[in-house]
Curated annotation (Swiss-Prot):
It is a multi-pass membrane protein. GO terms for cellular component: plasma membrane. Keywords: Cell membrane, Membrane, Transmembrane, Transmembrane helix. Disulfide bonds: none annotated. The chain crosses the membrane at residues 687-707, 712-732. This is Uncharacterized protein YbfG. It comes from Bacillus subtilis (strain 168). Belongs to the FadG family. It holds the Pfam family Ybfg_C. The keyword Repeat does not apply. It is found in: Cell membrane.
Amino acid sequence: MVDEMVLITQQWLNDTYSGKHGYNPVEESGKTGWDTIYGLTRALQIELGISEPADNFGPTTQRLFKPLKRQAPDSKPSNMNFILQGALWCKGFNPGGFTGVFYEKTENAVKEFQKAAGLTTQDGIVTTLIMKALLDMSAFKLVSGGDSRIRQIQQNLNRDYNDYIGLMPCDGLYGRDTNKALIYALQKEEGMSTSVANGFFGNGTTSLCPTLTPGDSRTGFVLIVQYALYCNGKSFDPGEFDGKYGVGVVSAVKAFQEFMCLPQTGYADMPTIKALLSSSGDTTRTASACDTATIITAEKAQTLRNNGYKTVGRYLTGNVRTSSGLTSKALTSKELAVILDAGLKVFPIYQDGGYESSYFVKDQGTRDAYSAASAARRLGFPSGTTIYFAVDFDAYDYEVTDKIIPYFQEIKSAFTKMQTFSTAPKYEIGVYGPRNICIRTSEAGLTKYSFVANMSTGFSGNLGYPMPNNWAFDQFYEGTIGSGSGSIGIDKDGYSGRDSGASNVNPPSDPVYDARLRTLTDILSTIPALENLTSLANAMFEFDTTETIFTSPELDIILSTSLLATIPSEGSPNTITITNGKPGAYITGLLGDTQTSLTASQIDSYQNLLNSLSLSVRNGYLEVYVNPTAESLNIQIKIYTPDIPVGDNVTTGLTTTITFKIKTYKGVPVTSPESELALDWPSYDQYLFPVVGVAALLLIGNMGSDLTNNKGVKVATALSAMLLAIFAYYTS
């Protein structure tokens, strides 16, 4: 919606300052934004004679700015007053017009702003403090979703501590600015000067932090505790903000201490105050839980026990970078036995990435869900175990919306599907990440418990966010304990008791199933377009099924498995025999005349595919069929593995069928099912071209007459067509 007075301001700025050094023209949209605020700021600096105008209201601007106040009648308009009135309009305060003169209505607008900011002095004089706050996008009126009592806190902080914090927003939303302002207020009460106070709860602030008890007369400290309690959740409402440490404050402090698993004294001591204002809280406090990327030996497990730890978080998969290179951080059955034998409990963490926004792309949640559940089942974690999926970066709120929420939606969908398998453990979903991510995934119904990355106190996702209600573990300090072979680096974790961790495991014992699963994984990993789908072959996989594992308007991929591994008929032109991982023929011999349509690199690619498939099969047979229909060209690979080694001279069998269904486009005449199929595939170029590509069409053209007449097709020719079709699709 266009604001006429904002539009007039934008037009005046461009008319007055365009072409002047340091001024950047603003968009004349009638909408307030940083573009307009920066334009007003640069205009002010030009009027102040600053040689190099900039977007920020910095020290030089503050030093040169002189207060503006009501003028005498018949005063001449000035650019300074135009800038002031434009800033007031952008802020939502009505100065009575855009006149360039500072009369009663402009003065009243300034007074209204001073009142909205919580200032005691409401004299209508525009000081540096006022002008700097006006030239900013912060809101000073209660916004949608805001809390009037949070706004009262913000106004009170502006009233009492503006020499430390300037003027902070008064929008009713608890966030980073309010959190830092509370720390500045604490630092002033502790006696720090404006040159020392920094809004960070460091060692100096910690050492000066008071212990407040019922009846404490230090009103400033008590008010800060009252504010902080309310900002951490309405469950900790202390009552009126009156600076009195009464029954309401005692009750709220005890409730907060209980929630954070701190000693429930009712006294606002340093650990309590620091927990109210900083995500990590008192990092010297004891903890009964920890997490580590280090593989735990018997000596390290004893170190954990000796230091009071009862529960430890370990990674299901992955590596960690050390000075000597990449080292596995993955939990093993052997290590798990050591941990449990030491009387420790375990909570599993999944992190094979997640350090930056680019990791969280479509289908990543599905892949991670299957990988995590497969690893957990293989290790024997029982139903009810919560797996914590890591989001290990400071995601902005829009990234949580656009990337993190969809990621966990995919995980939940995959877990729901896995739970339909009768043999699958029923795992719960947890999240590791900053507070905002934990809160939002929980509120969306996507996670049961939160493992909160509170150690990162400077994360925007921690500053100004309360502790999630479903927190299970609270990561707050990194260090090393023990010595010699018992030395181990850990993160100390607060423990709420919501997730007790696993105290026993029951690994599945089915070597035949595992052997088949390994073979299927190996086969999928060798075929282009399927290497990213190997997560389907996980410990929840059910054999003797048929499933479409990829679908699009142009291509479907269908996977079928059978526990019967019948040996194909000898002499079939579609069959290659594989012995000890080697194919019974070379690609050039199989291609025959078809190879004239291919480049040397393409022929090498097909040979490599054939070799890789042969290695995954070890001993068995490979068949390829090409079946054209009115709707699609179907290329089917059948892999027979009749002698999969299990152990102790025991073998098992498996037949894997992968069908690539390359679809035709609408508008192509379709032969009725009753009539003889007589498609002229070479004439389909215009329809297949976007999917299959030129090279594949050449091959299909070479095969056309054989296909139409239902003759056999050489296996290598079919493989070539399949490869080119897939490559063309995935690179188009």
